Amino acid sequence: MNEIQLKLCDIQGRLFELSVDRQLGSAGFIKTFMNSETAKALDSTYNRMQWAGEEYLLEEVIEAAGDKLDETGEVYSKDVIYWIGYIYRYWHYYTEESSKAIYKQAPVETMKRNYLMFHTMAPEVAIEDLKEIYKQK
């Protein structure tokens, strides 16, 4: 993982944190984001969206989602949601899988359920364990 990729992992983690500041239901926001055109743009080798900043990215997701973005539901702690956002982006760089494919393997419920166990692990180990959980389904 290079420095730029790690910075983009941090940006995505902070983007997810901003959804907490906006009091968006976390599960709905994460699902919407991971299946969005914004996430797809971040998956590309180079896209201007990667350097747009988390505030702009959040506005893009909210605008594109329209009424589909649920403002109800549990709002996760910033620690949990940052880790989820960071790991999802790290996973993309680690495996080159799309955000949509990653979300299919580890939906938000899986990420939240395993946070306490996995957040202290090296990202690669957590990702491999999450992939193993998916394979066992």
Report each predicted region and the residues it spans.
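C-terminal alpha-helical interaction appendages
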Residues: M1-Y94, A106, F118-K137
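Catalytic and binding regions of secreted/periplasmic enzymes and modules that target cell-wall glycans
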Residues: I102
